[in-house]
């Protein structure tokens, strides 16, 4: 019997400094505590700010055990039922199934190894695989993958456009992930219908392609995340999205029920 898994999917949102000098950027904060963290820093060699996802490192033996458990879980878990549960219920369910399979497969694991493997089971079954930690990052607005062998890019609220250390290297694996995105959006994608756009349960918008007939580097996807709480006028002013005068003008238009057209 392993000790209880504690996973914080909504860690405290940190205050990030806005630095004019990009070479001074070096911040780290939790995404899925205590397993996944983001490290944003200036790379002197590449002369750019990078977004590095830090996750638990698995030994070769741990990778083999993870693959065995994942293969067995896919045969017995109904994913449609699983994703309808609460986060707490899903964590408990994955935990019980993992312990059952470890026992049936006669595997031995230390407590630390089990925690790391459990994180990847949760990430890959309940979450959105490699990009699940990015979905948990409050500061990320857009996630973009332009095919295999190219880094996933993100748009950050504070540090804007950045390259990540996430790279899909296998066409079939990326195609499978795009299928998963479509399923989570309640849509269908295939060779006959290789384009889709839809919404994830959290409201995030997804656009994706499926085959090399559509895009040269294989399947692609873009996710535009939305905040659960809409921006307030003071926040829009603080972010310099709008000036006080612009908001005052909108206020007058709305108050007198004028017609408004917003593009972009």
Model-derived features with residue positions:
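N-terminal accessory targeting/assembly segments
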Residues: 1-189, 201
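A general structural signal for well-ordered secondary-structure junctions
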Residues: 140, 259-260
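P-loop NTP-binding catalytic core
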Residues: 145-259
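Hydrophobic anchor at the beta1->P-loop junction of P-loop NTPases
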Residues: 262-264
């Amino acid at each position: 019997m392993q000790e209880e898994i504690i996973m914080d999917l909504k860690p405290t949102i940190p205050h990030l400094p806005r630095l004019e000098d990009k070479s001074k950027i070096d911040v780290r904060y939790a995404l899925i505590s205590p397993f996944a963290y983001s490290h944003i820093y200036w790379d002197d060699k590449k002369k750019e700010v990078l977004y590095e996802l830090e996750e638990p490192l698995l030994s070769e033996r741990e990778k083999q055990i993870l693959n065995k458990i994942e293969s067995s879980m896919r045969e017995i878990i109904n994913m449609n039922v699983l994703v309808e549960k609460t986060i707490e219920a899903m964590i408990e369910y994955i935990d019980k199934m993992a312990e059952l399979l470890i026992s049936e497969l006669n595997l031995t694991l230390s407590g630390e190894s089990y925690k790391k493997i459990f994180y990847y089971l949760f990430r890959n079954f309940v979450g959105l695989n490699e990009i699940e930690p990015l979905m948990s990052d409050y500061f990320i607005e857009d996630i973009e993958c332009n095919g295999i062998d190219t880094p996933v890019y993100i748009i950050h609220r504070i540090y804007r456009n950045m390259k990540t250390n996430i790279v899909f290297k296998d066409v079939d694996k990326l195609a499978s992930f795009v299928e998963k995105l479509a399923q989570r959006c309640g849509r269908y994608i295939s060779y006959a219908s290789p384009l889709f756009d839809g919404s994830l349960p959290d409201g995030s918008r997804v656009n994706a392609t499926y085959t090399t007939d559509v895009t040269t580097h294989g399947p692609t996807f873009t996710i535009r995340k939305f905040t659960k709480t809409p921006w307030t006028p003071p926040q829009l002013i603080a972010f310099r999205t709008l000036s006080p005068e612009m908001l005052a003008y909108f206020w007058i238009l709305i108050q007198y029920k004028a017609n408004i057209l917003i593009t972009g």
